[in-house]
């Protein structure tokens, strides 16, 4: 038995933040009904066709769900949704500002149908303030939160190439809902869980925020190198690049003895502690790459392993598909879809009592008629089709 079996989730969701949240609930056994616009569907369905004709974003965050394609702007479509609300345990939405309230699907209205309902509202900036009404996309939140300002090189700031603001919002929505379920169990009370993408990213930005406490100098943009730890990053060998990092004085001593084979550097005035090494990072890099210039990447890794220095490969994405550790730990499964079987990774949290659910990625509106029939609207299906509500 999965932890959330028996829970019904209704989600009006688009793209990443809400879909990632609800996919994780579905992984744990919740039944997730995904409400989509007829004919159009979730915007992410149209982002690309990289996975045998299905969009890569959509494949990632929509397994285990049922797709209900229904027009909520039509009174009959909205009435159907309100009919099933008494049976809904969790309601999730990441609509544009004010849309859920205009539809009568805000928390104050929803709790009239079910006082114990858990409602999760995801938005860019949260309610209120001068930003509450603004549109928000991942890039904008990365920028507003300061992440872009510290990412990149000295010459250019860059965005993180994955939708990290959306992902963080989805993660906090998921954990917030689990907290609300525990609160419901203890008190019998439902909850409204509000998630602001900006606040999610601000939480993740706490280290650089504190680093600049009282207007101190912000972390330097250093590409793949660490702003405040040296050595920590990619260093060139004879035939490639090796990524590694040091964390303490013991590792610096071991690194100098075994990897660089130069013990004079251990207590060198410019390098004897991390603050000095970071101040002189360009010198450290020059010394390291001079020592590595006649060594293959494998030889460098062998020395790092002998010195017990953490290191890793700079893998291309096609190498991640074949990563030996993912295979050794049997992390890959297959999920069904409208185009056949698609490989998918199990969720990262592994529980010894159960394996996460890994069911089909739905086609647009695949479950519309079965859901209408289940909730007593069999006689309305033809009418809804005529009116293009479904």
Briefly describe each language-model feature range.
Residues 230-307, 311, 381:
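Aromatic-enriched alpha-helical interface/lid elements that frame and gate functional surfaces
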Residues 170-190, 203-213, 256-263, 267:
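Oxidoreductase and adenylate-handling cofactor-binding alpha/beta cores
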Residues 156-165, 236-240, 353-355:
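Flexible glycine/proline-enriched surface loops and loop-helix/loop-strand junctions
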Residues 127, 154-164, 185-201, 220-227, ...:
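Conserved Rossmann-fold dehydrogenase catalytic segment
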Residues 1-8, 219-220, 236-237, 319-390:
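Terminal low-complexity tails and localization/encapsulation signals of metabolic enzymes
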Residues 305-326:
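Conserved PLP cofactor-binding pocket of PLP-dependent enzymes
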Residues 1-186, 363, 369-390:
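N-terminal helix-loop segment corresponding to the beta1-alpha1 unit
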Residues 39, 125-126, 197-202, 239-241, ...:
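Glycine-rich beta-alpha junction loops
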């Amino acid at each position: 038995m999965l932890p959330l079996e028996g829970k019904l989730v209704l989600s009006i969701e688009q793209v990443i933040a809400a879909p990632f949240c609800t996919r994780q609930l579905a992984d744990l056994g919740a039944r997730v009904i995904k409400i989509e616009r007829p004919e159009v569907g979730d915007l992410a369905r149209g982002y690309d066709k990289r996975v045998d004709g299905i969009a890569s974003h959509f494949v990632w965050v929509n397994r285990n769900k049922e797709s209900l394609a229904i027009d909520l702007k039509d009174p009959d479509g909205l009435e159907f949704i309100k009919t099933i609300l008494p049976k809904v345990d969790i309601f999730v939405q990441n609509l544009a500002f004010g849309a859920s309230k205009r539809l009568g699907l805000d928390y104050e209205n929803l709790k009239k149908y079910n006082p114990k309902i858990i409602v999760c509202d995801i938005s860019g900036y949260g309610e209120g303030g001068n930003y509450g009404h603004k549109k928000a996309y991942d890039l904008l939140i990365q920028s507003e939160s300061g992440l872009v300002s510290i990412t990149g090189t000295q010459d250019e700031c860059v965005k993180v190439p994955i939708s990290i603001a959306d992902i963080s919002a989805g993660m906090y929505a998921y954990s917030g809902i689990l907290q609300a379920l525990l609160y419901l169990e203890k008190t019998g009370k439902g909850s409204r869980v509000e998630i602001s993408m900006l606040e999610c990213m601000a939480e993740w930005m706490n280290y650089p925020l504190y680093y600049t406490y009282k207007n101190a100098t912000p972390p330097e943009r250093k590409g793949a190198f660490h702003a405040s730890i040296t050595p920590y990053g990619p260093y060139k060998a004879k035939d490639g690049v090796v990524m590694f990092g040091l964390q303490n004085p013991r590792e610096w001593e071991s690194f100098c003895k075994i990897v660089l084979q130069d013990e004079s550097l251990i207590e060198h005035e410019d390098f004897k502690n991390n603050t000095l090494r970071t101040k002189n990072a360009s010198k450290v890099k020059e010394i390291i790459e001079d020592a590595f210039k006649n060594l293959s990447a494998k030889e460098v890794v062998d020395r790092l392993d002998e010195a017990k220095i953490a290191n890793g490969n700079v893998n291309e994405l096609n190498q991640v598909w074949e990563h030996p550790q993912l295979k050794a730990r049997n992390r890959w499964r297959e999920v069904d879809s409208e185009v056949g079987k698609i490989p998918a990774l199990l969720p990262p949290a592994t529980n010894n009592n159960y394996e996460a659910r890994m069911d089909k990625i739905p086609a647009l509106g695949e479950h519309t008629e079965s859901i209408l029939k289940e909730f007593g609207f069999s006689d309305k299906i033809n009418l809804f089709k005529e009116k293009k509500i479904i």
